[in-house]
Amino acid sequence: MRTHIRRFRLSDTFLEPYKAKEVPWGPLGYVTFKRTYSRRLNEFDPEATGSEEWWQTCKRVIEGMFAMQKDHVFLLGLEWNDAKAQRTAKEAYDRLFNLKWTPPGRGLWMMGTKFVEEKTAAGLFNCAFRSTKDLSHKGGYLFAWMMDALMLGIGVGFDTEGAGTLTIKEPQHTNDTLVIDDSREGWVDSVHLLLDGYFFGGKVPKFDYSAIRPAGALISGFGGTSSGHAPLKELHENLVKLFKDKVGEAITSVDIVDTENLIGRCVVSGNVRRSAALAMGRHDDRLYLEMKNDDEKLYHHRWGSNNSFHAVVGMDYEWHAAQSQANGEPGYIWLDNART
């Protein structure tokens, strides 16, 4: 839990001229802004209606940025010059209003919200990466981590290094009931529990979805509207379908990617949430590299990641190039070059 104890505000006198000032939008700029980055005003004032206009989003972003900076300065025991900060903030506001700069999309959506100030700043991250090489002992936690990040709007990269490191097991299905909490954490925990059942033979209770708010209900923290419990229930069912006939078999790279893609399919159902993922496999793993040749699974969930492979300088690319020519993937990542 994070708590801001020091606020930063731009004055009403400064903001007033911008309320009626024309914004230099392009043909689709305003529509895109209102669709993707404009938050409901009742998040900040229970009596307000409608959603932010650009001047209000700029206010939220700039005040959030400087409040975060102010907290950091005081945390380090440094000197805070409010007059200097106000001058810089006003210049930043004017430049943002006139589209001379913008923060990342995550910043436009999340900066200055109670979610970032009181819960986690992870919602500001653009991307993250998680290796599956320690899948044999971390199990479902790895995919829970990915799901949590995706639900925060973070793009997630992952690899297939965990392939062959564990054997799928029969879960211990119990008659206990788990009422899934109506929160991001509740959804993630249920998936973690189910996957550990198949990865470690752990106990899996019956899931009760009754506490999850109905479709269309407002989400006050992250923003947007609820998709209801249907996408989560479908994810549980899809994961069971994926693993139930593989008990006794080693987990494959395809299983790893399918699991993440099914999670991404669930996350994308959540209105304002996006699901961007990048998978990286071995250059000689044909089953992985041909995953998107299956149209039925591609349209169901395998669209959920861009699939690339670890390319080796000097290798024969003929087969891979033919695959890329056919469907645009796989992508090529030269890690040796990226690290230098």
What are these regions (language model features)?
Residues 1-340:
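Extended catalytic cores of very large enzyme megasubunits
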